């Protein structure tokens, strides 16, 4: 029996397979690690539905992880995963003093987590991360969440969910950064423009390359780096070569999160032409690293310092050229939110529900 300490259960589609896996959902793993570090008296348990591809429980930075090895294998497999999650939680509820559940994404984790919370009379919140606020999310009607049960990662996501489903999340909690992950040593900004993210159509790295081609007309020696992997890689390599930019753009192989942060601290601009985002963690990280951020949207109603919101590719090009043309561009660090504050704000919701006073 482990009734001597409160237990906090997190339901998430995937989770790092080990402590060396820094590329799997960087923000959720930073949140979980910081939560456990901040509150050592709290027993944090993670239920990972689809990944890792294993069913063997393991420990990760002091957190117990139960993987259910769903592997995104289809409807029957998904139903079996849900049944196993339900069974595991039933056993856990008998042995632990469960304070609440946190579901990442308004999807299957929210469906099962909300069901379990209502069944056992526990507080639960679902954290909207991005794509789950768009039209066509069948889980919204299945979960039927109340506004008070929803946390949006940004003002944009709160507005998007309300526009599509007439539900406005009562809470907005943004992703924080961990200052300890950044080097304190001042570094020369030898990279003009950096792009960070999966190489998928949604991220629009074809536009990134087009912008670099435009910048090269003013700055022929412009230096750009793309960090990411994905199905668009070969097509993007072809585009780089066809544009004659092979000397200007480095398309790196898979890069660790620590290496990405180091590259950000050496970069002048994060260029993020994605067509849709919730709150890109790379925005917060790049701003803290001292880079300016240029993109097509703002996650919050009021842009942060050094964040430039543009409406077209032409405006994006002009803003980038303008920043690179300045002799004394300000590269001071901008803190959007610390990860410690993010964790505290989430736990405050459960505290308000009486989870930690019972």
Residue spans for each PLM region:
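Short alpha-helical donor nucleotide-sugar binding micro-motif in glycosyltransferases
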Residues: 254-255, 262-267
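Short hydrophobic beta-strand element within catalytic cores of glycosyltransferases
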Residues: 283, 288, 292-295
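Carbohydrate-associated surface elements
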Residues: 156, 176
């Amino acid at each position: 029996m482990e009734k001597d300490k409160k237990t906090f259960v997190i339901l998430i589609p995937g989770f790092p397979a080990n402590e060396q896996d820094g590329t799997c959902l960087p923000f959720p793993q930073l949140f979980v690690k910081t939560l456990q570090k901040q509150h050592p008296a709290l027993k944090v348990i993670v239920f990972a539905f689809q990944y890792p591809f294993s069913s063997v429980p393991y420990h990760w930075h002091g957190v117990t992880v139960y993987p259910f090895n769903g592997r995104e294998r289809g409807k029957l497999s998904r139903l079996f995963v849900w049944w196993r999650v339900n069974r595991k939680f039933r056993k856990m509820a008998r042995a632990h003093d469960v304070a609440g559940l946190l579901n990442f994404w308004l999807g299957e984790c929210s469906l099962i987590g909300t069901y379990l919370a209502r069944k056992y009379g526990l507080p639960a919140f679902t954290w909207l991360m991005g794509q789950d606020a768009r039209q066509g999310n069948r889980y919204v009607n299945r979960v039927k969440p109340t506004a008070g049960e929803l946390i949006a990662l940004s003002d944009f996501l709160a507005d998007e969910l309300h526009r599509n489903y007439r539900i406005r999340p009562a809470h907005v909690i943004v992703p924080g950064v961990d200052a300890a992950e950044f080097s304190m040593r001042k570094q020369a900004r030898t990279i003009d423009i950096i792009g960070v993210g999966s190489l998928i159509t949604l991220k629009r790295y074809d536009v990134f390359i087009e912008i670099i081609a435009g910048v090269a007309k003013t700055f022929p020696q412009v230096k750009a780096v793309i960090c990411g992997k994905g199905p668009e890689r070969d097509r993007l390599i072809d585009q780089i070569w066809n544009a004659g930019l092979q000397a200007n753009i480095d398309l790196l192989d898979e890069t660790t999160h620590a290496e990405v942060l180091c590259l950000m601290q050496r970069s002048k601009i994060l260029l993020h032409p994605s067509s849709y985002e919730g709150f890109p963690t790379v925005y917060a990280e790049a701003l803290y690293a001292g880079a300016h951020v240029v993109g097509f949207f703002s996650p919050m109603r009021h842009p942060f310092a050094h964040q430039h919101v543009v409406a077209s590719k032409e405006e994006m090009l002009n803003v980038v050229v303008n920043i690179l043309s300045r002799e004394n561009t300000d590269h001071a660090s901008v803190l959007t939110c610390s990860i410690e504050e993010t964790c505290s704000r989430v736990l405050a919701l459960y505290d308000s529900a009486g989870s930690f006073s019972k």
